[in-house]
């Protein structure tokens, strides 16, 4: 493939084909975040770190970002730092939960949901002891 074909393929993968001729600074915030992911993909990285990839997005933009992240995670390893637990549970195969900089749990989403320390710290659930 030539560079134009590869670029067009990536823009299609990112759902950004419609704004190929728009300067990056004029794109919506969500499209700018998608473009940032695309630049990382174009670099050939097999492992990608995403810091708060849905922060500041509307519900519809978050849903679109989650769909994109799921798609790119099929071929790459992703490390995601995210405070939106709904997004975390939707995306992750394994989760490490930190409280004040210390890991309190690392497990599957199902096990993390059931973990008492996580429930108390993030979900506001306290059990009788």
Cite the ranges covered by each PLM segment.
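Glycine-rich phosphate-binding loops of nucleotide-dependent enzymes
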Residues: 1-129
């Amino acid at each position: 493939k030539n560079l134009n074909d590869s670029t067009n393929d990536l823009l299609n993968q990112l759902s950004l084909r419609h704004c190929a001729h728009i300067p990056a600074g004029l794109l919506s915030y969500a499209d700018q975040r998608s473009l940032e992911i695309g630049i990382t993909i174009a670099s050939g990285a097999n492992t990608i770190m995403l810091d708060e990839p849905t922060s500041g997005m509307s519900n519809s933009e978050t849903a679109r970002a989650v769909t994109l992240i799921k798609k790119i995670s099929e071929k790459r390893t992703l490390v995601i730092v995210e405070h939106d637990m709904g997004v975390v549970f939707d995306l992750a195969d394994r989760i490490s939960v930190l409280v004040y900089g210390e890991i309190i749990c690392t497990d599957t989403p199902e096990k993390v949901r059931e973990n008492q320390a996580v429930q108390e710290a993030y979900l506001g659930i306290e059990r009788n002891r």
